[in-house]
Amino acid sequence: MCIRDRIRGQPGDSNANALSSGVLEVLKANPDLRLVADQSHEGWLPDKAMATTENLLTKFGNKIDAVICNNSGMARGVIAALDAQGLASADKVFVAGADADLVNIQYVAQGKEAAEIWKKIAPLAETAVETAVTLAENPDKDPKTLLKVDRVINNGAVDVPTIVTPVVLVDRKNLDSTIIAEGFYTHQQVYGK
């Protein structure tokens, strides 16, 4: 049995909800995985994620197999709590974050963190600009007919046409061929040499 924790971002944030929904789909498809905590963290703060992790480590006698975080900062908080218990190793506790902050990519390279989700900036920016220009040039038309919408997501108030941009799961195996090869960070920044 694998004991997992989800460290969620800001309560009600659509990104936190979308990321967490994806994690839940995986958990539901794998009944041998047990979710022991699902905690939102106001402000996406690393220190709150660290405190949550410290409490869970105490409650479960340091027997946590994985922690999935909605952003890199909270993953750093989790790793700080794990480090204090000698558990900051992807071989001991699987930790994943999202944002690919430099420190987290360094943790992936060092083996402290298992994976980061990298949202490529160029496709995000290009899609945002194309969408904004199209909407500005056609203010009286329905966005769903103008844009290549991948799906509609209800944000709790309205249905939002959504364009999905690619993300990359970065781990030790593909770190050099993704983050470094595409120039997001340099070899020097990641490895310090």
Feature map (PLM): residue ranges:
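A residue-level marker of the well-folded mature domains of exported/periplasmic proteins
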Residues: 4-193
